[in-house]
Regions:
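Conserved SAM-binding loop
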Residues: 326-327
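Conserved phosphoryl-transfer catalytic core
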Residues: 322, 331-336
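Core catalytic lobe of class I
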Residues: 2-316, 320-323
Length: 336
């Protein structure tokens, strides 16, 4: 039986997570606290509770190298950040989408406004916090690397000999301060071989993830989230909100509680994301064939980009009308 090119769940993502394959990346574009869709909150105070069951599910199903992209307003992201941190997601950086002055043109009353007009939103990148098992239980990866060497009873300086370096092992790979550097798989494999050949007898092999055998360099490298660098690209992305052919309009439906009289020129979704941005974040942290979750699909822009990029998207959308549009966009993307 041929495998589908994507999975679309017409309903709550909470009912779909258990049947989806584990994600390499999660792209979240849910509640902002701005009444931006039916089901969005009024204000940011309820956001943590709104996201909590989803964050718990992401945490259960994520792999050690899963990344999370979290779209929101500045304040919405700041409100949910503590929940993400306590749930085992480590902050990497924030991308700022600068929509330009055209985004607020004609919508600012200079006599009543008491702040600078907002023409941005953000997308925060998180990586799954890595804790590794050992003879003495789970430990953060930085602590685990040094602890395994110390457990062998070998002098710390011998780690440099094991890695064939002057001092990089003790100065970078095994240090416990801010100078710590993620060691390449080749170096971890060398540490493991040296410690197991020359260290004290132990019931749990040194640098083992399962208590049976030391970790290999190849296995070690899969524990770190992927990253594909693009020179010249910073964390500020300047692009006007969609207005051209990519923007979906004319559904004559109220896209959100604050939309009262939609016309044939009204956007189907108030905050449709550019495919250009979705391709950018997918390219940064995933490879062809990787599973991408889009739990709050809307118009499924992330999943459309995922299909175009050869990834395997799993998308959910609760709103019937949005789900219909998403289904058509996904089919069109697959057809090329």
């Amino acid at each position: 039986v041929a495998q589908p090119a994507y999975l679309l769940h017409r309903g709550d993502a909470l009912d779909a997570y258990g049947s989806w394959p584990a994600p390499v990346a999660v792209i979240s574009d849910g509640a902002y606290g701005v009444r931006g869709f039916h089901g969005d909150t009024t204000g940011v105070a309820p956001l943590a509770d709104w996201y909590r069951p989803h964050v718990e599910a992401w945490s259960r199903h994520a792999g050690p190298a899963t990344t999370l992209w979290f779209w929101n307003t500045e304040l919405g992201w700041a409100t949910v950040h503590p929940l993400l941190a306590e749930s085992g997601w480590d902050y990497v950086q924030v991308i700022t989408w600068d929509k330009g002055a055209g985004h607020i043109a004609g919508n600012v009353n200079g006599k009543t406004i008491r702040r600078f007009p907002v023409a941005t939103e953000v997308c925060a990148l998180y990586q799954r916090r890595l804790e590794l098992p050992g003879a003495d239980g789970l430990m953060p990866v930085q602590q685990w690397l040094r602890h395994e060497w110390q457990r062998s009873g070998l002098p710390l300086a011998r780690a440099n000999e094991a890695c064939g370096v002057r001092n990089a092992a003790t100065r970078k790979y095994l240090t416990q301060d801010w100078l710590w550097y993620w060691p390449p798989g080749e170096m971890v494999e060398r540490l493991a071989s040296y410690a197991n050949e020359r260290g004290a007898e132990s019931g749990w092999p040194y640098y083992s993830l399962d208590g049976q055998a030391p970790v290999t360099g190849k296995a070690w490298d899969t524990l770190r989230h992927k990253w594909r660098h693009v020179h010249g690209l910073t964390n500020v992305w300047r692009l006007a909100p969609l207005h051209g052919a990519e923007r979906i309009k004319g559904t004559m439906k109220r896209a959100a509680p604050r939309v009262y009289r939609p016309s044939s020129l009204s956007a189907a979704h108030l905050n449709q994301k550019p495919l250009q941005f979705m391709h950018r974040i997918l390219n940064a942290v995933t490879d062809p064939g990787d599973v991408v979750w889009e739990p709050f699909g809307g118009l499924a822009s992330a999943s459309v980009a995922a299909i175009e990029a050869g990834r395997f998207p799993c998308v959910a959308e609760l709103d019937h009308d949005f789900a219909e549009i998403a289904a058509q966009r996904l089919a069109d993307a697959l057809a090329g």
